[in-house]
């Protein structure tokens, strides 16, 4: 792992230990039992069946590489804007230290619309998956670069047992081989190298030949313009996770519609 990713994972393990003391598993299970589920994969497929791009629109205040992206940050307003302009799903950052996110942001965003929501965080422990279900998430992210294959398989199985969808994230061919051992149809290709934080959308295009037909390719990071979108769609990549381009716009949903529709 990179120094940056290493540091993030160390913090996550510390956070899990602290959270287990303040919110025991039984408490989370009770919270999770009161939450409804929305069909994350189904929402993506519905867009595809209509001939449209499926946009997983991100609610993201900041990032380690770019700093604060949006000073006026109201998750509920952002979520409504996305929902009103054609997003398929939401992705909400819940990492506090590195991305200035929170569980509360996810809860506020989900309550403001009917879209399924991905908890965007660095998952290293089953506790975080139950935590995601308890806060109202419909899907979680698993990052191949952060996990051993057997660990990832166990985490996926637990997520699916709770009814959560799984987006597995890769950056290169070796990681894709590992990701394809999972059952999830959602394969995210992060165009940002987590080792260097450099970005190139060629990363997604370079992995398409290895992608089975039964998987849905989600291109992540570096999609900043309509030209980027058209380039991807010309190669039959029709699912996008986009944050920065929307967060920097005055009206995130309007920017979404301008880029995609």
Swiss-Prot record:
One of its GO terms (molecular function) is phosphoribosylanthranilate isomerase activity. This is Indole-3-glycerol phosphate synthase. Its EC number is 4.1.1.48. It comes from the Bacteria. It is an enzyme of class 4 (lyase). InterPro entries: Aldolase_TIM, Indole-3-glycerol_P_synth, Indole-3-glycerol_P_synth_dom, Indole-3-GlycerolPSynthase_CS, RibuloseP-bd_barrel. PROSITE patterns: IGPS (PS00614). CDD domains: IGPS. GO terms for biological process: L-tryptophan biosynthetic process. NCBIfam families: PRK00278.1-6 (NF001373), PRK00278.2-4 (NF001377).
């Amino acid at each position: 792992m990179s120094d940056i990713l290493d540091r993030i994972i160390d913090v996550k393990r510390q956070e899990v230990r602290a959270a287990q003391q303040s919110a025991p598993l039984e408490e989370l299970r009770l919270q999770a039992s009161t939450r409804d589920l929305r069909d994350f994969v189904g929402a993506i497929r519905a867009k595809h069946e209509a001939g449209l791009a499926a946009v997983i629109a991100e609610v993201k205040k900041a990032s380690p590489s770019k700093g604060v992206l949006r000073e006026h940050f109201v998750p509920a307003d952002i979520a409504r804007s996305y929902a009103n302009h054609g997003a398929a799903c939401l992705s909400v950052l819940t990492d506090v230290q590195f991305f200035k996110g929170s569980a509360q942001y996810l809860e506020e965003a989900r309550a403001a619309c009917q879209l399924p929501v991905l908890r965007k965080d660095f998952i290293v422990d089953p506790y975080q998956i139950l935590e995601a279900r308890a806060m109202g998430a419909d899907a979680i992210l698993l990052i191949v670069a952060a996990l051993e294959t057997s660990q990832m398989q166990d985490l996926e199985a637990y997520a699916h047992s709770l009814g959560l969808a799984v987006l597995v994230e890769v950056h290169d061919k070796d990681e894709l081989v590992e990701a394809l051992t999972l059952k999830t149809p959602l394969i995210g290709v992060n165009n940002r190298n987590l080792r260097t934080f450099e970005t190139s959308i060629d990363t997604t295009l370079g992995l398409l030949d290895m992608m089975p037909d039964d998987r849905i390719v989600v291109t992540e990071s570096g999609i900043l313009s309509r030209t980027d979108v058209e380039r991807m769609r010309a190669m039959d990549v029709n699912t996008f996770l986009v944050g920065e381009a929307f967060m920097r716009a005055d009206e995130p949903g309007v920017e979404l519609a301008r880029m995609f529709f």
